[in-house]
Structure formats: C-alpha cells, structure tokens
C-alpha cells in the first residue's frame, strides 16, 4: 500500500477517535461498525483478542478478561494512590511487576499480563487500522492527544504505546489544545485570548484554561474530577430504575449482573435520547425472572437525579479560574468537549455561569479533540499541498456580513460562524425609475437594521442605464479569503460595469469584546428586531402595491379596457396612499396594513372586473416584483437605493 497522510488520534479513557485532514477539510473516520468513536476496550477470550466495539459488546459475558481504562494506569507506579483506588472498581486484575502495574488476564487458556502501554497500543493499532481501511493506504504518522495534566512519564508512556502500535508519533499534544485548534482559536487575530475548555467525557471531567497568543498555547490551569462522566449519570438512572422495579414488582434485581448490565445499556441509550427529546422510553423484555420492564423517564427527572453532579461541574470551573487568576468575564472562548456536554442542562448551567456567553459547540464534542489533532498532524507533516497553513484551523466569520437595503434593513449575505474561505452572491435592483447609481454599504452585525450594526465600508456603482425601478440587475458578491479579508463587488448585469472594495480584518473591525457584546445584545434585541423587520416589510409591501397598481392602470395595454372613472378612482386612491406614506414613514405595522386594506377595497373589484371582461390580461401584469418598494426620496428613512430581489 502507498503511504497515507498523517492522522490525529484522540486516545480516550473510555472511547477513542481518529481523524484525517484531506481535500481541504478534516474527516472523522468511522470504524467497521459505522461508529465515529471506538471504545478503548480490549478483550481476551479462549480463541481471540477483540478490540473496540467487539470487546465492549461482550464485556457482560467476560468481565474479568475485558480491559478498559488503561489510560488511568499508563505512566503510573503500582503504589500510586490513583492506581490503588481505581483497582477496587475494576473487574480485571492488576498485578505489581517490579513497582509497575500490569493487567492480568486469561488468553487462549493461559495467564497473560500486559503493561498499560501494551493495552493502549492495541487500541492505537485499532485506530490506525480504521484509518487505513478508510484511506486504503498505510498510516504511520500520527499526532496523539493526552490530558493537559499528564506528567512527563505519562506522556512518554503514551508515545511508547504509539511506537508499539507501529506509529511514528509526530507529537503528543494536550487535549484542550487540540479542541482549541479545532475551533481555530489560535488563528484569531488580536491580543492574547483566554480559552476555557470544558471536557466532560465518559469517565473523566477536565477543565483547562489556555492562553493563546500568536499561535502559542500556554496551559494556565487545569482542574476537574478524574471520576466524573457519562457513566455516573447512567448509574444514577440505573439506581432509579432498580428502585422502580422493586416498587412495581417487589423484586431486587441489583444482585443479578446480567439484568443490571441490560438495564445499564438501556439507560445509556435513554440518556442520549434525552439530549434531544424531553422524554425517553425503556423497553426490556424478560429483564428479571421473566418480567418485562417497560417504563419511561423525562428529561426533568433525569436532571433531578443528577442535579448535584451537574451543578458540581461548576466547582472545577471556578477552581481553574482561581488558579489562572482570571475572572470569568476575562474568558474569551468556551469550548465544549466530550459526549456528556450534549446534555442541555449542563450547557445551560455553564452558559448561565458565564452570563449567557455563547459556547463553542458546532463541532461534534466527541470528535473535537481528534479534529484538532488531525489539523496539527497535517501541519506537522508539512502538508503544503492543501495549503493547510492558510486554509485551516477552521476560521469562521464572527459576525454576519451584509449590505443595507431599502428602509435601512440589513440584508445578510454571509451568516455569522460561516467557515471561511467563502463566497456568496445575491442580486439586487433599483427602487426609483431611471436611477443612475446605487450605493453599496457593507455592514457587519446581528441586528435587523443597519443603524445598529457596524459600517465596514461603502462604494458607489454608477452609470446604470436609465430604466424603470426594479428592472436593473445588480449582482453583489461577498468573497472572504482564508485570511479573513473581505472583497465586496457589485456588477451591473446589463453593462458589465463593476466596482469593488476590499476590507481587511484589522482596521475598522470590532475587537473580540465588541463582538461578544454585540452577539449578546443581538439575543436581547431579537424580539425588537423582528418587530421592526415586520414593520418595514409591511410598509414596503404597501408602497409596492400602490406604485404597481398605479403603473398597471396607466399601462397602454389597458387603454380602452378600463373606463376612465375606474382608472381615476384607482389613481386618486394610489396618490392618496403615496402621499400618506411620505408623511408617515414611521407608522406602526398595523397602520400600514390598514392602509393596504383600504387600497385593496378600492382596487380589487375594478381589477377583478377587468380580468373577467378581458379573459385574463394580455402579456400578464406589468410591474410587480418581489421584495416590495422602498421609501420614496425624501422619506424619513433615506436608505441607500437598492432593493433585494428573490
């Protein structure tokens, strides 16, 4: 096989994950079971050795020979307090070999013992094979991640595990660093950033605070609980149902290992369901002594069962902040890692603790670490081809970008958090007859009206040939390159005439703090904005209707089809409405709607009559373009003269 690219491997306590950077993006690779994460489990049976899903699936039948949690042993001495306390909970045996721990199992009928590095190397081998099966190439180079608090011997042992697995470990990087790289936080411009990584996995909970400056990462503090994770939440649910079974059936299933195991599997599934639904049902046939167990649990009950554990996740956050000598307001970014951070309650507690700050969660939390490791692997293996240097570290546009349209409305072309580079084009038109030019004003921000957003720059496109309103087509293109530089161009489709502006991201752009603030304000103002948007839209719709109606009855195609009295009736009413609009630019939505009803009352009967007599109008209705009109000049809102076209 040919040599494949470098991969990133997240070697986790309970699950591992592998990713590769190719074709300009990171791909997280699924295993042969179609799962994008693989259990860090190795099982030994009379006939074979199983790794991953196969190992975890048979743990109930073969508990003493199924090894997991090797990460809790790696690089530690046998008499380490951690090893001694963990040993009590494991079904497999840990023995002392000259001061080093080894796991002892029965394999093919004989007793074998393995160092933690060997067990981890088996998991790494599996991850390597998963990547090779997907890529169809040999994989040797890898970046492997470890917790930030790992000491030198733990790091070295992890590297050794890689070597045993036949990998050339390019670098060992910290899990929180990898997660920050996944979100491209090291590529954001400006002064140093403080990033808090909240990593709640299957069996461990780690909080890390990093500072990033000029692409250099420094771990400021770490805190957490090495024995808190998804499994604990499962246990609470298991105990809840054991108690329920006792109440319902007067039987205690807690001593029956198989029953408890089946219940635990069902609980883990229910827990996952509760992250997206508010209720989950559990159905287990013949759980115990032939009794079928059918029950359900609500999200609220699940949250209540784990209330203390969920709340307790904030203690390490506070400790990490204290150790880093930072106030929570000084944290620029919060990154969620680990499957348990999908739990809505945990997200809410964390977001509330940080006063409503947005959390970085767009990358699958189980995969964020492997994602960042894959990016790092591509960089370290000198991937110049895809220009990973420039391209990646997944930069996004922090704020929406758009232009001002009729009535001072912000029309967004690029939504916030769009991955860059990106390019968007939209067509606009004029709002008054024979309008010679348009003013393109570029804004960033989340508000509905441009006056509440930040003006980045503006330019004019002139020399538009005389034409009725709504006829010219002006194509506006927003193009952001990998360095965040924005090019905005406008082209008049009829003449091909073009003008453009380049906006670089340093000057005139907002600071990170401003961005945070604006995003938060935007939430608060969303309701007001909706109202304002509705108002402008009902005003535009009334205006359009009046102008179009006027144009329709004045059209020469209708000469002789409409009697003068009807025509005058419509024109008078239209002119009355147009002059009312001039005086009442800031009226309420209801007033615009009322005026439109009045206008329709006059026009509809006449137009209907017209249609019936003409059997449909020749050439269809002239005028009438979507998006509605704009305030006539001199209106209170003297927005720029361009109009959105669907």
Swiss-Prot record:
One of its GO terms (biological process) is response to activity. It catalyses: ATP + H2O = ADP + phosphate + H(+). It is found in: Cytoplasm; Melanosome; Nucleus, Nucleolus; Cell membrane. It is a peripheral membrane protein. InterPro entries: ATPase_NBD, Heat_shock_70_CS, HSP70_C_sf, HSP70_peptide-bd_sf, Hsp_70_fam. The keyword ATP-binding applies. One of its GO terms (cellular component) is neuronal cell body. ADP binds at residues 14-15, 202, 268, 271, 275, 339. Residues 2-386 are annotated as: Nucleotide-binding domain (NBD). Belongs to the heat shock protein 70 family. This is Heat shock cognate 71 kDa protein. The lineage of its organism: Eukaryota, Metazoa, Chordata, Craniata, Vertebrata.
